[in-house]
Amino acid sequence: MNVRERCRRLWEDPGPRKDRSPFALLLEVFSLFYRVGVVLRNDFYDRELFRSVRLPCRVISVGNVTAGGTGKTPMVILLARLLKDLGYRPAVLSRGYGGKGKAPVNIVSDGASILMSPLEGGDEPVLIARSVPGIPVLTGSDRCLTGRNAIERMGADVLILDDGFQHRRLFRDINIVLLDSDRPWGNGFLLPRGPLREPPTRALRRADIVIRTGGMHNRTSGEAAGTQVETGDSGAVLLRSSPIFRGIHQPCALISLDGGRKMDLQYLAGERICAFAGIGVPEQFRKTLESLGAEIVEFLAYPDHHRYDSSDLAFIERTAKEARAEMIVTTEKDEIKLAPMEKLALPACFLSIEMRVKPQKSFEHLVLEMMKDG
């Protein structure tokens, strides 16, 4: 078992101090140093010893307090569509994690066409560009620089930061923070012993809007001030004055890898499925398929941002055939990396999912009011 896999298992501990192995204790020491560094950095920004850069347009950040998937990319897509439909000229700025484009500014999409592959631009930026045609998508480590390029070269009047909550160098008008409903703080530890990027109590003071995603799909969170957010692990509760909404990952369609034919979601009911995913929380994908009535005979979980090759596809096909699967299903994020490869022998599809925020009208109204007041 490699270091990454051992860390992942520690992060999935049901309790913060279940594993007391030497490896876990060593990571706890590293987490203490990390905590000191991140707290000092945030204090410097809070006291304006470090200054944030203001750009001449509105800036909205979408992020979270843990490493891993909470639905940031679907949320960015939702916001980009909303703002575009209302007549704004949004551009998305991403770190471009996993992409090979290392220039100071990488233009994944100029709004007219997609200019980079997932290998060059990163999985999420290409997915965003494909999902919202007509908006620029740029990557680079310096969001101030990519933001200026989006404004000056592409006419953007609002910037959306994908995974930008901790990037405090660029001032933002709205901070949207996504929390996993089941385990908002993971195992309670900061990196690298746990998935927390910063102490949550301090982090949520900067949040303007909180969205609870994943799990408990039939529950509705209130949007009024003072809504409770439970850790799910220690039972601690944070009371926030920020509005809290419910984010639901809504399956929309089943789309074939061969030709892009759309199929009704009911097609999955009773089907023997071999599913695979290389995303932040693959288990959530499995639960979604099961909720649609699929019989999952094999489920293959790959690391987030995994780069598939021919041997991976051969293994997936062989596994599916041995399990007598009738169909292979993956995520849209994984599908964009399969396009250049040979076709799978079995029928293969990807599940298209969109973010829905409830109550929708209240959320849209609040974002627009904050845009005007910013």
Curated annotation (Swiss-Prot):
Any one biological process term the GO annotation gives: lipopolysaccharide core region biosynthetic process
Family note: Belongs to the LpxK family.
Protein name (Swiss-Prot/TrEMBL): Tetraacyldisaccharide 4'-kinase
Lineage, uppermost ranks: Bacteria, Pseudomonadati, Thermodesulfobacteriota, Syntrophia, Syntrophales
UniProt pathway annotation: Glycolipid biosynthesis; lipid IV(A) biosynthesis; lipid IV(A) from (3R)-3-hydroxytetradecanoyl-[acyl-carrier-protein] and UDP-N-acetyl-alpha-D-glucosamine: step 6/6
Annotated residues for binding of ATP: 66-73
Organism of provenance: Syntrophus aciditrophicus (strain SB)
Entry keyword annotation includes Lipid metabolism: yes
Cellular component terms (Gene Ontology): plasma membrane
UniProt entry keywords in alphabetical sequence: ATP-binding, Kinase, Lipid A biosynthesis, Lipid biosynthesis, Lipid metabolism, Nucleotide-binding, Transferase
Reaction equations catalysed: a lipid A disaccharide + ATP = a lipid IVA + ADP + H(+)
Stated role: Transfers the gamma-phosphate of ATP to the 4'-position of a tetraacyldisaccharide 1-phosphate intermediate (termed DS-1-P) to form tetraacyldisaccharide 1,4'-bis-phosphate (lipid IVA).
Cross-referenced InterPro entries: LpxK (IPR003758), P-loop_NTPase (IPR027417)
